[in-house]
């Protein structure tokens, strides 16, 4: 009898655990819950940055819940390093799950910059010094010019989108449905220094 009672209690605990998990599953978040979570900025862990208004908050909340460890490591990297003094190159954060690429390049005229998107990774873009324009568009509203290349995790497009000026202190996030057109000049052949953190996308 005691053995049956123990199994019954364990079953109840398992069901309760699954129920609790269902209550916090990212797909169950309401718009208000997403907005509250986003506005609290606890996920920044004190990092003095501003998320750009173009960020899809619902997708961000879901990805953060699914891969919290990856996101925390990405934001910790930004907080713990003096980006202004770091050389251009690739920096490991969590193997192939999270890594950073710092570049210092002249910005381009808009016709030289391509629309792109990625399936396996989310892009976090942050200008460290200088400025650039970044285009943002829904991939469903663009025309594919280069089919998905699995080795490069890259797809290119043509079409129209919205353009924003990226400056130090504000970061952009681009998810698989977000085409982006970065490194565009704001006038003249100005160089800028930026960091892109690649964060593995959770299906």
Feature annotation, model-predicted:
Residues 82-144:
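Mid-length scaffold segments of soluble, non-membrane domains
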Residues 184-188:
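Short proline/glycine-enriched turn/loop segments at secondary-structure junctions
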Residues 120-124, 132, 162, 170, ...:
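Generic beta-strand structural signal
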Residues 171-173, 189-203:
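A short hydrophobic beta-strand segment most commonly corresponding to one strand
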Residues 131-166:
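A short beta-strand-loop-beta hairpin characteristic of the jelly-roll/cupin
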Residues 34-102:
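A short, N-terminal "cap"/entry segment at the start of jelly-roll beta-barrel domains
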Residues 165-183:
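Conserved metal-binding segment of the jelly-roll/cupin
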Residues 1-29:
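Bacterial Sec-dependent N-terminal signal peptides
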């Amino acid at each position: 009898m005691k053995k049956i009672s123990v199994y019954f209690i364990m079953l109840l605990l398992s069901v309760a655990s699954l129920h609790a998990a269902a209550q916090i599953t990212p797909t169950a978040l309401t718009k208000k819950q997403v907005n509250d979570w986003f506005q609290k900025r606890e996920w920044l862990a004190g990092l003095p940055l501003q998320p750009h208004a173009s960020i899809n908050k619902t997708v961000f909340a879901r990805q953060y819940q699914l891969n919290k460890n990856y996101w925390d490591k990405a934001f910790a990297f930004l907080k713990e390093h003096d980006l202004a003094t770091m050389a251009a190159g690739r920096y490991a954060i969590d193997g192939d799950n999270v890594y950073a690429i710092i570049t210092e390049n002249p910005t381009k005229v808009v016709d030289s910059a391509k629309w792109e998107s990625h399936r396996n990774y989310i892009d976090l873009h942050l200008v460290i010094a200088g400025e650039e324009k970044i285009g943002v568009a829904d991939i469903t509203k663009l025309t594919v010019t280069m089919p998905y290349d699995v080795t490069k995790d890259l797809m290119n497009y043509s079409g129209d989108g919205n353009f924003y000026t990226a400056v130090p202190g504000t970061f952009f996030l681009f998810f698989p449905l977000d085409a982006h057109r970065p490194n565009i000049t704001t006038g003249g052949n100005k160089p800028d220094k930026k960091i892109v953190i690649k964060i593995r996308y959770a299906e």
